[in-house]
């Protein structure tokens, strides 16, 4: 099968969030399973020169938008057997930021149309175009529009993945002019969203199939609490929406070979995980003692459940003999909150208000528990990484957290973590205390083993995507 995979970012070239992890690893697994996959992302100024100097220039073509003729430079690089294409236009991508520019609408409309035209330029007669999130949502709209008058595009089927419904690509109705699409697209059954246009809505309407990054999230977004104003559209098109849970790249996240760990370990010698814990305590100036170490590696924003953390942290640190390690940046109020708790409990909490990839590896290996009390979590990657390293997740049952973390049952000995259901601070505190109670008995090693035995690589997810593709091209 031939697949064009379009995204705004892909690891290891450019990364601002979890989308890059997916776009950088899922196509590799599809290739491994015997399919012809090509990935397309913009050629950002921010991509490391070490990669850029290896890119091969393939030529150029032009995209017409809003009565303008826009240059598209085409570069190619083969990464782990997969062809990655980088589309160049200095006006749009020679910026200091990936997102958040004043002309994001125009930038990603240009990129989306260029992705569709790229197929003809490289003569790639693909079966599937797979786009991701609002940045490339218009790819599927253009593919449908091109198919009306061009036989080259008639048989191509489209899939769109929602990684986070919160960010939809909503722009003023005047922005429709920048797309070069007919005014007929400004209707309720197309791009119109109140008095604006909505890229993500367009992808939901015009794609052959729509996926979310977990099965539970696909159900949740049908309701107003999670639907971000699009729940009506989600319910209308429910028949073509399904969930496929993300995986992780287990070659990168592997405690046996991870170069960042203080000491490598595996399920067979899991006791060596303790050496990572002791080294982590030393690194952050915490007392090296046998107490549970809880960690959070996250963006410090409200939807990560930080209001629940704010409500219980003082009581938790006052009453429990624990240590807490934080790694991440985000909203000022939450950054200051953790700085305050570090000041108040210097022997119990270390707040690292920054992000460092190497330190994240050390924390995943050295902590005993990972806290993820998210209000909503489309999939979540941190809990998958934590389990890979034998660090036990404590989560709220939402989205991908519900799909991947099974609360431990002390009678059947099944389960790979701990969970609670309600958005309630003391339910969270109770669950933390329940986790601590198992730290001091023999079941703790069983839970760690269950977590490490959880299969969270991309193999199963890639197979599900391929099955989905096969369904729609029959």
From Swiss-Prot:
Keyword Glycosyltransferase: yes
Disulfide cysteine pairs (residue numbers): none
CDD domains: GT5_Glycogen_synthase_DULL1-like
Catalytic activity reported: [(1->4)-alpha-D-glucosyl](n) + ADP-alpha-D-glucose = [(1->4)-alpha-D-glucosyl](n+1) + ADP + H(+)
InterPro entries: Glyco_trans_1 (IPR001296), GS/SS (IPR011835), Starch_synth_cat_dom (IPR013534)
Pathway where it operates: Glycan biosynthesis; glycogen biosynthesis
Similarity comment: family membership: Belongs to the glycosyltransferase 1 family. Bacterial/plant glycogen synthase subfamily.
NCBIfam families: glgA, PRK00654.1-1
Function noted in UniProt: Synthesizes alpha-1,4-glucan chains using ADP-glucose.
Protein name: Glycogen synthase
Gene it is expressed from: glgA
